Amino acid sequence: MEQKKPLIILTGPTAAGKTKLSIGLAKSIGGEIISADSMQVYKKMDIGTAKIRPEEMDGVPHYLVDEFDPSEEFNVVVFVERAKAAMEKIYAAGHIPIIVGGTGFYIQALLYDIDFSEHEEKESYRKELEQLAKEKGKEYLYEILKEIDPEYAQIVHFNNVKRVIRALEYHKETGHKLSEHNKEQRQKDSPYNFAYFVLYHDREVLYDRINRRVDLMMEDGLLEEVKGLIEEGYTKDLVSMQGLGYKEFFDYFDGEMSLEETVDKVKRDTRRFAKRQLTWFRREKEVVWLNKKEYEQEKNLLDSVLNIIKEKGICNGTKR
């Protein structure tokens, strides 16, 4: 039997502090990082995505960061395809891939090698649902989803029309709930020898970090970044512009919301998103939870992660 290849996953809600830990980990074991963030993949969208800066990378190779134009669609199928290609390159160099990011759906698809091609989307039904969303609003589709699959509705925001439509399509096509399908996929055996870490803070601390992060984004020029994208012709119907910290500003630029209200909305939406992320990770199996408050220093946290990786036989210790 072929030996399973090593894979490390470092995830957690937005603003948990994954970036710093991921760099320390990569430098310790000779790892290379693949981003599992559905937004950091886009060019020109740096502030609102809290994209890692080149100087923060500290020489560690990164994949799926700053690779797509905002006009392009990035989805789970493209992610898995690109991530697997990057992993082959990393393995060939004798290094270990580290998946870092908060898009749990992408991580699950890669970790358990889920094939999405078996459920071909029905073009006509999708267009029908898209039309419904235009005529009656996103909330209308979301209410249908809540009736059909309330469990899945808990972890997807009504603004994420693409995922709402996918769940409705899946139900129409198979007669089953997408939440049940996801549970079945989680029971699959992963083709990798993996360690799955979820870094988190207690809720009050996390929410405070989110609020402060949004304030810092505004100081760093988030408003100007969004304005520049709109002036370049990027419209609100694009997948990229539906991201947190971007979609909220369209109402502001249309004169329907004050700047203060917009910033509050970004904070609120981000807090809700973090809550949904944690709900997703709780449903995953073989997860190691890392509560930041239990570690006095970053080094203690890194040492704990390295010990677990060693115990799992993923690597023998530090390489750098």
Q: Where do the PLM segments sit?
A:
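Phosphate/pyrophosphate-binding catalytic cores of soluble transferases and nucleic-acid-acting enzymes
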Residues: M1-R320
